Curated annotation (Swiss-Prot):
May play a role in signaling pathways governing cellular proliferation. Residues 603-627 form a coiled coil. Keywords: Coiled coil, Cytoplasm, Cytoskeleton, Repeat. It is found in: Midbody; Cytoplasm, Cytoskeleton, Spindle. PbH1 repeats lie at residues 480-502, 503-524, 532-554. InterPro entries: Beta_helix, PbH1, Pectin_lyas_fold, Pectin_lyase_fold/virulence, SHCBP1-like. It comes from Xenopus laevis. This is SHC SH2 domain-binding protein 1 homolog A. The keyword Cytoplasm applies. Transmembrane segments: none annotated. Gene3D superfamilies: Single-stranded right-handed beta-helix, Pectin lyase-like. GO terms for cellular component: cytoplasm; midbody; spindle.
Length: 699
C-alpha cells in the first residue's frame, strides 16, 4: 500500500484529476495501450500505420539442422483475413491485366523496404540474407548475405562462393515469394511478414499463368480470387469429396502443361521467318489451335469446380464415388475370400473367430483368408460374394467406403465394439451400389461431415443390428434402390434421419430413429408420377426428433393447378377423384380405431365387474384410460401416415392418367390400393417429436 500511495499520491482540494501528473499518466496510458493493443501499435512508422490484416501469432523454428533464427509464423491465417486483404487492400476491383500493378502498390504501403533479415528459401538450399532494398514493380528484394554465413543445402554442401556467384548472376535480386522474414520482438516487421505471406499465398494458390490473358472487362477478385480462395479453405477443412479434390489437382496440372506447350509453340512461331517455313508454320498453327481448344475445355472444367454452386450441382454427384469405380464381379479364378480386419488380435480372439465364423465357412478347403488393418482396404479388395469380418476395435477411415459388388460386411461382436469412424468432411461415408449388400453388427460414426452417412444408389442393401451416429443426413435411399433396415439405431442427423426417394423400396423393422431434425423424409416430385414408393414400417420407435416423425415433401397445389384445371375441363371428377380431392383439401384424416375402441369396451366391462370396490374401480379406470390413450396415439400415427401417402399417390396417378388421356393414350384403370404403397405399417411408436407425428412440406 505504501508503494501504491507513493506512486499515486492523493488528490488535493482543487486539483484536477486529468491534470495531475499528466506526463506520467500519459506514459502509463501508453504502456497500458501497448499491452492491451499490441497489434495496433503504430511504432511511429508510416509502414506500420497501414491497416493490419491478419495476425502473427508466434515465432516458428525453421526445419532442418542448421541453427537459423526463428521466423514469423504466418501460414495459419483464417479465410476472412486473407479475403479482406485481397478484396479491400491488395486487389480491389482490378482487372486481370492490372493485378501486378495493384499488388506493387499494396506492397509499397505495407512493406518495410530495408533493414530486416530473412531466409532465402528454395528447393535446393536455405540461406540467411539481409534485405537492403525492395523493387516493388518487379516484386523482387535486393539482398546481401548475412554475417556470419548460414546456409543449409537440401542436396549437397554448398560453399559460400557458390551462393555469392549465384547472387551476382541474379544481380542480388531475389523474388519476394522466396523469402521468409526473421522474427523480431519489436513488432516493427510484423506487417512486412504478413504482406509477404499474402503475396506468396496469392501466387502459389490463387494466380494462374493464363489469368492475364483472360478478358479484361470483369472484376478479377469476384471472378477468380474469391471462388479459388473459398475452394482452398473448403479443401483444407475436408469439405470437398476426395475424388473431386484429386480431379481438380489433375485438371490443374494438365492445364499448366498444355499452357506451357502452347506458350512455347506460340513463341517459336513468332520468332520464325514466315517466308522460309510457311508449310511448317501452317502445321504448327493447326496444332496451336488444338492446344488452345484443349486449354479452354480444361479451364471450363476448373471453373466448374471452383464455383461453389456449380460445384454442388454438377460435380458432387459425379464424385460421390458410385460412378468412379466399376463393379469387379466374380473373382477371375472363382471362389470366395474371407477378409479379416483387425489392428491387433489376441490368441483367444483368433481361436473364437476360427471356431465361430471361419470353420463354418470352411466347407471349401481351398477357401482363402486375407488379413487387413483397414476396413476400406478390405472392401476395395473384395470381389462379388466375398465376406468381410471386422474384429472389435476403433477404425479410422480416410475416404469413401464404396461398395459396388454383392458382399457381406459383418462385425464380430456387438456394434459398440466394432466402430468405424469417418475422418474428413467432404465424402459420403458409405455408398452402396451392389446388387445385394449386407452390413451387420457395425457402428458408423461421423464428425463434422457435410455428406450423409450411407447412400444407397442402386441394388439392395441390408442393415442389420447397426448403429449410425450421423452428422448431416442419415441414410438416403435413391431411386430404384432398396433398403432393408432391421433392429438398428440411427441418431444425431441435423437433417432427416432417412431420405426416401420416389421409385425406391424401403423396409424398416424394429429400428430406433431419434434425435434428428426429422425422422423420415419421403420425397415426392411432380415429374415422377409412375414411381410408386414401396415402404414397410413395422415396430419402429421414432422419438425425440426436433421436427416431425415422418415428413412428406410434395409439390404445392399451385404447381399442379394447371393440371387440375385441365382435369376439370375434361369432365366431371369420378368418385375416386372426388374422394381424393376431399382428402387433399380437407387434410383431415380419420384413423381406424376399431382395435382401440375394442380395448375401451373391454375396459368398461371390466370396470362394471368391479363396481363393488370403489377404490379398485378408480385405479382400474385410470389404468384403462392410459392404455386407451396410448393405443389411440399409436393407431392414429400409423393410420395418418398411411392414409395421407395413399391419397397423395392416388392423386398423382389420376393426374397422370388424365394427361395421357388428353394425348390419346389409354391405360388400364387399375385401382391403387394401400398394399401397393405399404406392405405393412403397424406397431410403430411416435413419441416426443417436436412438431408431431406427420407433416407435409410443400415446395
Amino acid at each position: 500500500m505504501a508503494e501504491a500511495e507513493a506512486q499515486f499520491p492523493p488528490l488535493q482540494d482543487g486539483d484536477d484529476f486529468f491534470h495531475v501528473g499528466s506526463d506520467r499518466c500519459s506514459e502509463e496510458l501508453r504502456d497500458v495501450k501497448q499491452v492491451l493493443f499490441q497489434e495496433e501499435d503504430d511504432s511511429a512508422s508510416d509502414y506500420g500505420s497501414y491497416k493490419r490484416l491478419g495476425k502473427v501469432t508466434s515465432r516458428t523454428v525453421p526445419a532442418g539442422n542448421m541453427l537459423f533464427p526463428d521466423l514469423f509464423q504466418t501460414n495459419n491465417l483464417l479465410f476472412y483475413e486473407r479475403f479482406e486483404t485481397y478484396k479491400d487492400y491488395m486487389l480491389g476491383d482490378c482487372k486481370p491485366s492490372e493485378v501486378k500493378e495493384f499488388i506493387a502498390e499494396y506492397l509499397e504501403k505495407a512493406l518495410k523496404p530495408s533493414g530486416w533479415n530473412a531466409i532465402w528459401h528454395t528447393d535446393v538450399f536455405d540461406v540467411l540474407v539481409e534485405v537492403t532494398d525492395v523493387e516493388f514493380s518487379s516484386l523482387n528484394a535486393i539482398v546481401r548475405l548475412s554475417e556470419p554465413f548460414l546456409c543449409e543445402s537440401h542436396v549437397s554442401s554448398i560453399a559460400l562462393e557458390s551462393i555469392k556467384d549465384l547472387l551476382d548472376v541474379k544481380d542480388q535480386r531475389v523474388p519476394l515469394q522466396e523469402i521468409r522474414v526473421v522474427f523480431d520482438e519489436s513488432g516493427l516487421y510484423n506487417q512486412t511478414a504478413l504482406a509477404i505471406e499474402h503475396l506468396r499465398f496469392f501466387y502459389q494458390q490463387i494466380w494462374r499463368p493464363w489469368d492475364e490473358e483472360e478478358e479484361d472487362y470483369f472484376d478479377y477478385f469476384v471472378r477468380c480470387v474469391e471462388p479459388r480462395l473459398r475452394l482452398h479453405y473448403d479443401i483444407l477443412e475436408d469439405r470437398i469429396p476426395s475424388g473431386l479434390v484429386a480431379e481438380y489437382s489433375s485438371l490443374l496440372l494438365q492445364c499448366e502443361e498444355v499452357y506451357m506447350q502452347f506458350t512455347n509453340l506460340r513463341n517459336n512461331l513468332s520468332n520464325k521467318d514466315s517466308d522460309s517455313e510457311s508449310e511448317l508454320d501452317n502445321v504448327s498453327m493447326v496444332e496451336g489451335m488444338k492446344m488452345d481448344n484443349e486449354m479452354e475445355n480444361l479451364k471450363r472444367k476448373l471453373k466448374l469446380i471452383e464455383n461453389p454452386l456449380l460445384r454442388y450441382l454438377f460435380c458432387y454427384q459425379r464424385n460421390s464415388g458410385c460412378h468412379n469405380v466399376q463393379a469387379k464381379g466374380p473373382r477371375p479364378n472363382g471362389g470366395k475370400v474371407i477378409h479379416v480386419v483387425s489392428t491387433s488380435m489376441s490368441i483367444l480372439t483368433l481361436q473364437c473367430l476360427t471356431r465361430e465364423r471361419l470353420q463354418p465357412e470352411s466347407g471349401n478347403k481351398d477357401l482363402e483368408i486375407q488379413f487387413h488393418r483397414d476396413p476400406l482396404e478390405a472392401v476395395n479388395a473384395c470381389y462379388e460374394g466375398d465376406l468381410v469380418i471386422i474384429c472389435p476395435g476403433l477404425y479410422a477411415v480416410y475416404g469413401l467406403i464404396n461398395i459396388m459388388d454383392s458382399i457381406e460386411i459383418e462385425g464380430y461382436g456387438l456394434p459398440d465394439d466394432v466402430v468405424i469412424e469417418k475422418m474428413g468432411k467432404g465424402d459420403t461415408f458409405v455408398a452402396c451400389s451392389g446388387a445385394h449388400i449386407k452390413i451387420s453388427n457395425v457402428k458408423f460414426v461421423q464428425h463434422e461431415a457435410v455428406e450423409g452417412i450411407i447412400t444407397i444408389h442402386s441394388g439392395k442393401t441390408e442393415l442389420d443390428n447397426c448403429v449410425l451416429q450421423c452428422e448431416t443426413t442419415g441414410v438416403t435411399v435413391k431411386k430404384s434402390a432398396e433398403l432393408l433396415m432391421k433392429y438398428s439405431d440411427l441418431y444425431g442427423a441435423k437433417g432427416a434421419g432417412m431420405e426416401i426417394y420416389p421409385g425406391s423400396k424401403c423396409t424398416l423393422i424394429g429400428n430406433g430413429i431419434h434425435h434428428c431434425r426429422d425422422g423420415i423424409l419421403i420425397k415426392d416430385f411432380i415429374d415422377v408420377v409412375c414411381e410408386i414408393p414401396k415402404i414397410t414400417m413395422e415396430n419402429n420407435v421414432i422419438h425425440n426428433n426436433e421436427g416431425y416423425a415422418v415428413v412428406l415433401v410434395k409439390p404445392s397445389l399451385d404447381i399442379e393447378k394447371n393440371s387440375h384445371n385441365e382435369e376439370l375441363e375434361g369432365g366431371h371428377l369420378d368418385d375416386d377423384d372426388k374422394m381424393i380431392e376431399e382428402q387433399t383439401s380437407s387434410n383431415i384424416l380419420q384413423p381406424n380405431l376399431n382395435k382401440a375402441m375394442g380395448v375401451e369396451d373391454k375396459a368398461v366391462e371390466h370396470t362394471n365387474n368391479l363396481e363393488k370396490d370403489q377404490g379398485n374401480l378408480a385405479i382400474a379406470k385410470e389404468e384403462v384410460e392410459c392404455e386407451y390413450a396410448i393405443d389411440c396415439e399409436e393407431a392414429e400415427g400409423n393410420q395418418v401416415i398411411a392414409t395421407e401417402l395413399v391419397a397423395n399417390t392416388r392423386r398423382k396417378t389420376k393426374l397422370h392418367k388424365k394427361r395421357l388421356s388428353t394425348l390419346g393414350i389409354v391405360t388400364a384403370d387399375d385401382k391403387l390400393t394401400s398394399q401397393e404403397i405399404f406392405v405393412s405399417i403397424v406397431g410403430n411408436q411416435f413419441k416426443r417429436n417436436g412438431k408431431g407425428t406427420f407433416g407435409t412440406f410443400l415446395f
